[in-house]
Curated annotation (Swiss-Prot):
Chain residues that bind Fe cation: 118, 122, 308
GO MF annotation list: iron ion binding; N(6)-L-threonylcarbamoyladenine synthase activity
Coiled coil: none
Organism placement in taxonomy: Bacteria, Bacillati, Bacillota, Bacilli, Lactobacillales
EC number: 2.3.1.234
Name of the protein this chain belongs to: tRNA N6-adenosine threonylcarbamoyltransferase
Broad class of enzyme this protein falls into: transferase
Entry's cofactor comment: Binds 1 Fe(2+) ion per subunit.
Amino acids binding substrate: 140-144, 173, 186, 190, 279
Localization (cell): Cytoplasm
Amino acid sequence: MSPTEKRNLILAFESSCDETSVAVIEDGHRILSNIVATQIKSHQRFGGVVPEVASRHHIEEITLCIEDALAEAQVGYDDLTAVAVTYGPGLVGALLIGVTAAKTVAFAHNLPLIPVNHMAGHIYAARYVEPIEFPAMALLVSGGHTELVYMPAENQFEIIGETRDDAAGEAYDKVGRVMGVNYPAGKTVDDWAHQGHDTFKFPRAMEKDDNFDFSFSGLKSAFINTTHHADQIGETLNKQDLAASFQQAVVDVLAEKTQRALADYPVKQLILAGGVAANRGLRERLAADLASNPTTHLVKAPLKLCGDNAAMIGAFAYVAYQHGVLADTSLNADPSLEFDWVADPVK
């Protein structure tokens, strides 16, 4: 880069749920800063995220996160190329804080504003591991979503399978609560699963159905019924075995559906993304399944970027910007935002 050439720097915002995050990303794949202010302790006593509490924390943290992100990256507003923000899906109040902050910065400093689908951000976290090669497939597993997303080319998405009820991450939190685990329960359940055995034969709903959709409500109900029955008769169940049996059922369904999707949609990469992508059991199973696949390479989002963060938003924003995806100051939060087949510019 010549001394007069301006760097491509995106200031990215993420506030869709219970993490306030601001990052500075260079060229879509280099993290100069990624500030994350978590709210987990504030929500633990409620057993889950309380939208009003989340919004209040975002208001308190957003300005500090901006200042810290710029300071850590050692850049100023004049150095920025654009501003990016998650505008959905998520909690409407939480989203509005990030959207408002991003629009304010963009307007005040005359910078382009890039709207980002939160779920696309999760997928593009893989860009910090290696470039995404197309066609690609993403198994997107989080607290609110469980989806198989086919990507024939850059900036194109097609959901070919999704949960019909509970998301996998939501099921983890619910069974964790039954076992007395604080929110979020995923890591503890995963740790216990590695210490136990698959002794409870929980159902694997839709595993053999002729589609790529998922269902975890039946598994959750079977788990709750098993523990409730044990309580009624005074039986103590091994929590590690319960966790192992539950996790095995979840992983079996996710892996089976993914393998069948890959058979119908040949791709160069399978990207594992979302909060549940940090699950050791799932990462190990997919790695084993794809070890013998000569054409599809598994790319796992970095553990530190599996949860909500602005770095992943900046990664996809860079791609969206190259495709002319821009918004103006009329951009609003869209809590029910879905994937478009093509990520068209927001008007």
